[in-house]
Each structure stands twice: as structure tokens, then as C-alpha cells.
């Protein structure tokens, strides 16, 4: 549920940014249709890249901690 709310908030920010960047031009279409798909996809790609940069090292560290924990437990049982 929170993911959908965050997604809508991000889209509304993109729409407001694109609306504020078009000054002095009469817009005959709605603001949401003026945002191009390529702009949204490039923003999503940048967001995914940032998330992967953060999550991949975290997953590696957590995996290493779990591996050490598992190894120590196996040594204690032996």
C-alpha cells in the first residue's frame, strides 16, 4: 500500500516539475499527458540504479554475516 502511495507522489512531482518548466507556452493537453514516456523511464532507471547501488552491498554484508553465524553454529555443535 505504501509503495503505491510513494509511486503516486513521485509521479505528481514529475508532473509538477514538467508543468513549471513550460513557461509562456499555452498547453492544450493535460499536464499528465505532457510528460513523455522517455522522461519517466529515464527517471525510473535512475531511481532503480540508485536503489541497486545501495541494496547490493547491503545484501552482500548481510549474507556474509549470516554465513559467519551459520559457520560458528556448526562449529559449536561439532
Swiss-Prot record:
Q: Name the membrane topology term.
A: Single-pass type I membrane protein
Residues in the Cytoplasmic compartment per record:
73-78
What InterPro entries is this protein classified in?
Answer: Glycophorin
What does the UniProt keyword field contain? Glycoprotein, Membrane, Sialic acid, Signal, Transmembrane, Transmembrane helix
Task: Tell me where it mainly resides.
Answer: membrane
Annotated compartments: Membrane
Q: How is it modified after translation?
A: The N-terminal extracellular domain is heavily glycosylated on serine and threonine residues.
Query: Which stretches are Extracellular in the membrane topology?
Result: 20-51
Q: Where is the signal peptide?
A: 1-19
Which parts of the chain span the membrane according to its record?
52-72
What domain of life does the native source organism fall in?
Eukaryota
According to its record, what are the GO cellular component terms? plasma membrane
Per the record, the coiled-coil ranges are none
> Which Cys pairs are S-S linked?
none
Its biological purpose is as follows:
This protein is a minor sialoglycoprotein in erythrocyte membranes.
Which family is this protein grouped under? Belongs to the glycophorin-A family.
In Swiss-Prot or TrEMBL terms, this protein is called: Glycophorin-E
Q: Which gene encodes it?
A: GYPE
Amino acid at each position: 500500500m505504501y509503495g503505491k502511495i510513494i509511486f503516486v507522489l513521485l509521479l505528481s512531482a514529475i508532473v509538477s516539475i514538467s508543468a513549471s518548466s513550460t513557461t509562456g507556452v499555452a498547453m492544450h493537453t493535460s499536464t499528465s499527458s505532457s510528460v513523455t514516456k522517455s522522461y519517466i523511464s529515464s527517471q525510473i532507471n535512475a531511481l532503480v540504479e540508485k536503489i541497486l547501488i545501495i541494496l547490493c552491498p547491503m545484501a552482500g554484508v548481510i549474507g556474509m554475516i549470516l554465513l559467519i553465524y551459520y559457520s560458528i553454529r556448526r562449529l559449536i555443535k561439532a
